[in-house]
Amino acid sequence: MTPEHLPTEQYEAQLAEKVVRLQSMMAPFSDLVPEVFRSPVSHYRMRAEFRIWHDGDDLYHIIFDQQTKSRIRVDSFPAASELINQLMTAMIAGVRNNPVLRHKLFQIDYLTTLSNQAVVSLLYHKKLDDEWRQQAEALRDALRAQNLNVHLIGRATKTKIELDQDYIDERLPVAGKEMIYRQVENSFTQPNAAMNIQMLEWALDVTKGSKGDLLELYCGNGNFSLALARNFDRVLATEIAKPSVAAAQYNIAANHIDNVQIIRMAAEEFTQAMNGVREFNRLQGIDLKSYQCETIFVDPPRSGLDSETEKMVQAYPRILYISCNPETLCKNLETLSQTHKVERLALFDQFPYTHHMECGVLLTAK
């Protein structure tokens, strides 16, 4: 695979290999055949980051070869959304001959939505001043004149300049309902929007007919919490990153959802609160004991669940686990399978043509 060519003719073969690999990894815990969810074969990534290489009067996007670490010039990137590809061309054209904007520019980050909005961040090894702002505003206006719905941000050490805003609002059709999700620059968002829709719809399907409340750890901008709210009486969700919590609160209001409560705390802290080990001021006014959480949802980082959280989630009759790293999922299942069995298993091809797999399991108490 090269940056400017995707082996689309190999898509089905690479997906089949992932199915076999996941089944093999899951064999100690389940003999289920995974439900398989396919990605678009190109233009599936809604965000991308590129270093900028200065070559005399020219400059261009580059990425680094993972094996050799050599730099590769990238003028188009078919894995990224069509809007990112349009912006890559337009940004280089707008910056190349502008001394203020190109000087000490070392990276450009792109974040886009299916609703055709974009935030583009320009990263510099220099101080940004009023002259930079004026030139950046002129570039933004020129991009908008090309019908590109874009917001620009300048970043340097201890500096962030937003020309308008640092977020965009995604609109996703999820099981017959449009969901609005505010996505903040430099915060985690699901990279493959088409796959995200399928993940949300699968999670809705496996939690149909649920009783009681839902607890979610690591909720981000509320991506899963808000979509799943319709299947539960109430949802209690935790998140540590301030921008994500703020986005989640906005998304609750934008989607007119009244049964979701977001708490800003780490999963480890929440475990302590639930077990009565510590009291937290952030939980004042929230009666944890009033929640009847029959289901817990976890979408942990690549490192998986820590041992204390493993023990905590085992107390719930149903565990819905989305994993971006099946190796740590299987490590967690060594513990979780002592008390729970795998009822549903799904493979989400979040990153085609790579070894990465995203998967989902529903576990029920034995």
Curated annotation (Swiss-Prot):
Pfam hit, one: tRNA_U5-meth_tr
Uppermost EC category: transferase
GO BP annotation list: tRNA methylation
Entry's Gene Ontology molecular function annotations: rRNA binding; tRNA (uracil(54)-C5)-methyltransferase activity, S-adenosyl methionine-dependent; tRNA binding
Active site: C324 (nucleophile), E358 (proton acceptor)
Gene3D superfamilies per UniProt: 2.40.50.1070, Vaccinia Virus protein VP39
EC number: 2.1.1.-, 2.1.1.35
Gene Ontology cellular-component annotations: cytosol
Keywords from the UniProt entry: Methyltransferase, S-adenosyl-L-methionine, Transferase, tRNA processing
Binding site for S-adenosyl-L-methionine: Q190, Y218, N223, E239, D299
Catalytic reaction(s) noted: uridine(54) in tRNA + S-adenosyl-L-methionine = 5-methyluridine(54) in tRNA + S-adenosyl-L-homocysteine + H(+); uridine(341) in tmRNA + S-adenosyl-L-methionine = 5-methyluridine(341) in tmRNA + S-adenosyl-L-homocysteine + H(+)
Entries under NCBIfam families matching the protein: trmA_only
PANTHER family the record matches: TRNA/TMRNA (URACIL-C(5))-METHYLTRANSFERASE, TRNA_TMRNA (URACIL-C(5))-METHYLTRANSFERASE
Function of the protein: Dual-specificity methyltransferase that catalyzes the formation of 5-methyluridine at position 54 (m5U54) in all tRNAs, and that of position 341 (m5U341) in tmRNA (transfer-mRNA).
Family recorded in the similarity comment: Belongs to the class I-like SAM-binding methyltransferase superfamily. RNA M5U methyltransferase family. TrmA subfamily.
Protein name: tRNA/tmRNA (uracil-C(5))-methyltransferase
Gene that encodes the chain: trmA
